[in-house]
Amino acid sequence: MGTSSILSFAADGTEKTLSALTLDDVKSYYENHLSPSVAKMSFVGGLDQKEVVASLASLEKNWKAKEVKNLSTEYLASAEWKPESKLYFIDYPGARQSYILIGKSSMSIKAADAYPAVVVNDKLGASSQGLLFDILRLKHGYTYGAYSNFTQGLYNNYFAARSSVQATVTKESLALFRDILSGYGNLYSQEFLDQTRETILRTMYGSFETPKALLGMLRMINAYDLADDYQMQRVQTLKAMTLDQAKEVIAKDLNFDDMVIVVVGDAKSQLAGVKSLNLGKVELVQNDATK
């Protein structure tokens, strides 16, 4: 990825870019990238469509639609995730905790295996009932929590497992992450799948009873061009999913060998231990924020 990718820049900017921002830049952005033509609106409430449209008449009159450039398509669609190293250690001198992040690029929300991936992640790290929390927190006491998730949209899609651990057990914690992730496919069982199915179905049926929840569903349909019945499609996928299918998803989308590791911590005391795990090429990165 590196500094050549748009993904290497914070979305809210840096001190340098913010300092250089001018009023003309803001006006130019408004002129070239903001328009009702790229806006999407979702509504839940006691008004019918005719009443909602009427309430927007003044906005339609005073803010004329025009074609503008979609920056998401221009930058994110072409962004590549090709790290040069397997493990990046970001030095934070004197840190009493180490932050561990392990991940890989993944599928978009519209991919066939998008929801199955969410299903298999449930027992891995979706909550405090997952293996990561159970082993790193409850069994070893290395952290207050350890979790994993798939972030799915149209462009910047990835899997990530993470935790903040005591600095003195950085090596041990990273070894546990490796063992859990690399062994998850063999460990995953019919019992895991049945428990996940029961948990998700129980919560899903009652999760769209409020206007706010319904609005969230409409926003998903709007933002990602999903089918109107995408939630019911997910229910059917979950009910029909087999253990073999789950294991196939794990092998494809949770392959530890494809993942990149980032550790933020005190390099003086922890880097040697991390290197001793022989997880691949290690690159030491100096943290400018600590200077």
PLM regions: where:
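M16/insulysin-pitrilysin zinc metalloprotease superfamily fold
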Residues: 126-128, 147, 151-208, 275-279, ...
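Scaffold signal of the M16-like zinc-metallopeptidase fold and its non-catalytic homologs
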Residues: 1-36, 56, 152-153, 207-240
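Short beta-strand/turn micro-motifs at beta-sheet edges
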Residues: 27-31, 87-90, 145-151
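Active/ligand-binding-proximal structured segments within catalytic/core domains
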Residues: 102, 111-125, 131-134
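Solvent-exposed, non-transmembrane alpha-helical starts
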Residues: 54, 110-114, 170-173, 272
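An aromatic/glycine/proline-enriched structural segment found at the starts
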Residues: 35, 40-108, 263-291
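C-terminal regions of mature proteins
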Residues: 40-46, 188, 192, 197-291
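Buried hydrophobic packing residues in well-ordered domains
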Residues: 26-29, 41-44, 56, 102, ...
